[in-house]
Every structure is written in C-alpha cells, then in structure tokens.
Amino acid sequence: MNTHEFQAKQILRKYGIPVPDFYIASSSKEVEEIIKQYQLQSAIIKVQVHAGGRGKAGGVKLATNPQEILEFSQELIGKKIINEQTGPSGMISHQVLISPAILIKKEFYLGITINRELASRVLIASPIGGVNIEKIAHEQPNQLLMLPIPLEETFRSYHLIRIASFMGWKGKQIQEGVAIIQSLVKAFKETDASLLEINPLVETKEGHLLALDAKLSIDDNALFKHEDLKTLFDPSQMSNNEARAQQFELAYVALEGEIGCMVNGAGLAMATMDLIQYHGGRPANFLDVGGGASQVKVAEGFRIILSDSNVKAILINIFGGIMNCETLASGIIEAAKGLQIHIPLIVRMEGTNVEKGKQLLQQSGLKILITENLTEAAQQAVQLAQSVR
C-alpha cells in the first residue's frame, strides 16, 4: 500500500525524525485559512499523488508571496499528474501539501528497502539527494552505500561511523544523522514497510538535518496487524478497476495491449504475458486470481477485463493445483453467460479434474476455444485478437 508524502512525514515525525512544518488543503478556502493562520509569506506547494517525479510533471511550485500561494494551490488542487510512474491514465491530486519555504545547503538520500537477493532489509545512503536513486546507482555507483540491517535490528557503532563518514556529516550532524538512521530502522520494522525513504534529507542553513520529502510503502500482507495504517489508504489514487480488484483480492495491473489475461499465480501470469508478447501480441493486463479463486472472483475478473475497450480477446490460463479445474470451468461459464462476452475466449487449463472442467466448457454452448498447451493458447489469442480488429 502506497501512502502520500504528508502521511509518510506524519509517520517520520511520530518516530522523532525532524520534518518541516506542513499543512494540507483540498480547497481554496482551506488554503486561505492556512495562509492567514500561519502568516505564510512564501511556501512550497506540492501535489499529493502516489507517484514520484512530481516536479518534472509540474506538480511542485515555489510561491514567493501569499497571493502566489493561493494561486498555485488552486492550480494544483485537482491537477492530473502524468508521467512514467502514474501511467498514461495519470493520477489526480485532490489535495496539496503547503510547507514554508526554507533555505538549504545540501541534499542527501536515506532509505530502507527489502533486498531479496540478500534476504535482508537494506539501508541505502548517498551524499547526493533530490534525484532518482536509480539514476545515482547507474551513473555514480561510488556515491551509493548499501548496508544490510543486522538481525538485531540496530546498527553497531562502526556501521554508524561508516555511514556518517560516507555522507560527509560533521559535528552535530553526526549525532542528528545517527538518530535519524536509528529511528528510520525502527519505523521501517514497526510499520512493516517495503520501502521507506527520505529524499532529500537536507542540511539547513543552520546546519541541521531535516527530512524534506518522504515516501512510505507498506506491505499489503501485513496490514491486518495495523488497523491504524489501513486508514492511510487513498482509493482515489487507484483506477476503478484497481479498486474493484483489491476489493475482491485480485492482483491486477492495467497495461496497454489488446489481449486480456486471467491466470492463477503470479509466475504463470508473467510467463503467459511473455508468450503473448513473443508471438506478436500485447497483454492488456496482469490479473492473478489466486490459487483458490471462487466463481465470484472469476466473474469479477471478467468484468474488470471487459471494462477495457481495447481488449479484443481473453486468454485464461489456469493450473489446477489448489484450484479445481471443474470449479474454474463453472465460474467461467456462469460469468460468460451473465456478462454476454462477444470477443474470443481462449482457455488453457491443466491439473485437478481437468477433463471434467474441459467437458463442462465443451457442453456449455459457449464459443470457447480450448487449447492443449500454453504456446498454442498464446498463438490463438494473438491471431484471434488481430482478426477482431
């Protein structure tokens, strides 16, 4: 689950990490009240969307007087941000973050994520901040320090000295930086985060360290432990299909192709998409219905796929391990009849009760093409999608 910048900053503040003052507004009236109450003369105004690259997309403004604060806020409330991270449909900012402008001397980067190769939480630090960390890793790898976080969830003194030296901190900055690192590790663990970053962490003109921007992503599988964090979820940052998919516990990602995919298992879904691409087609989505999908889930998966007008064919690829092929076939039939599907439907299934499942499909009276293997299924899906055009 992604969060907004202001929510991530609230979490950082809770753990004692210094962040600048900020205010949230979703209307012109609220902006006017903030300007008056806090006597703002200059401010940074930022859109609040679940994506980075907001500045380049026109979503960050520097206002040098109260009138500009109001005008820029009005411009950004309701603004649609479109970039690589939002996808072509973009994301709408329903509120803005207003923060008094401050003078800074230097920018740093601090973040924690999961490194699956090391099977460990990893701290990432760089004396260069305010830019995409992947860009630093690619262009200036010597400016990046990665340290696995020990099992005891705290760094030893020599680790902290190494980080402070690498970042170029001196004097009181060392003490402040060490405290921020320790609090960041604690916050990451206690929120069950998958990503927590401060970018940039800045040195103010007074020489103090301050978290100027923050990003927090929480592991969806751990949300059952965090009723308080569940309230941070903002459904407006998802498409209607993504929100529906989450409601029915379907893993769904919209793409830009013409072949809808319904698969059980993330690995099998990726392989299915690769084969479609290999044979000259383009997947319209990633949709994993999970190992124990019910007829209701299958039907909802169909509804989500069919809501995309670009879809010209649907490929269903199921391995009946946990899922029974007979149950799946019943779900397909019920959904297809109820939704009146008028585009080619290709089904490839293997596993438990596969013959009974195929028999049900064959006797359904529906125009369903049953294939024997995945390669044939992908080829047929591509050919039929092209014929619909």
Curated annotation (Swiss-Prot):
GO CC terms of this entry = cytosol; succinate-CoA ligase complex
Cofactor: bound how, per the entry note?
A: Binds 1 Mg(2+) ion per subunit.
Q: In which pathway does it act?
A: Carbohydrate metabolism; tricarboxylic acid cycle; succinate from succinyl-CoA (ligase route): step 1/1
Where does the chain bind substrate? 264, 321-323
Where along this sequence does the record place binding of Mg(2+)? 199, 213
Q: Its Enzyme Commission number?
A: 6.2.1.5
Give the GO biological process terms.
succinyl-CoA metabolic process; tricarboxylic acid cycle
Show the catalytic activity. Answer: succinate + ATP + CoA = succinyl-CoA + ADP + phosphate; GTP + succinate + CoA = succinyl-CoA + GDP + phosphate
Q: Which SUPFAM superfamilies match?
A: Glutathione synthetase ATP-binding domain-like, Succinyl-CoA synthetase domains
| EC top class named in words | ligase
Q: What UniProt keywords apply to this chain's record, in alphabetical order?
A: ATP-binding, Ligase, Magnesium, Metal-binding, Nucleotide-binding, Tricarboxylic acid cycle
Q: Give the similarity note.
A: Belongs to the succinate/malate CoA ligase beta subunit family.
Q: What does this protein do?
A: Succinyl-CoA synthetase functions in the citric acid cycle (TCA), coupling the hydrolysis of succinyl-CoA to the synthesis of either ATP or GTP and thus represents the only step of substrate-level phosphorylation in the TCA. The beta subunit provides nucleotide specificity of the enzyme and binds the substrate succinate, while the binding sites for coenzyme A and phosphate are found in the alpha subunit.
The protein's matches in NCBIfam families, at most eight in alphabetical order, are given as: PRK00696.1 (NF001913), sucCoAbeta (TIGR01016)
The molecule here is called Succinate--CoA ligase [ADP-forming] subunit beta
The species this protein belongs to is Protochlamydia amoebophila (strain UWE25)
Its taxonomic placement starts with: Bacteria, Pseudomonadati, Chlamydiota, Chlamydiia, Parachlamydiales
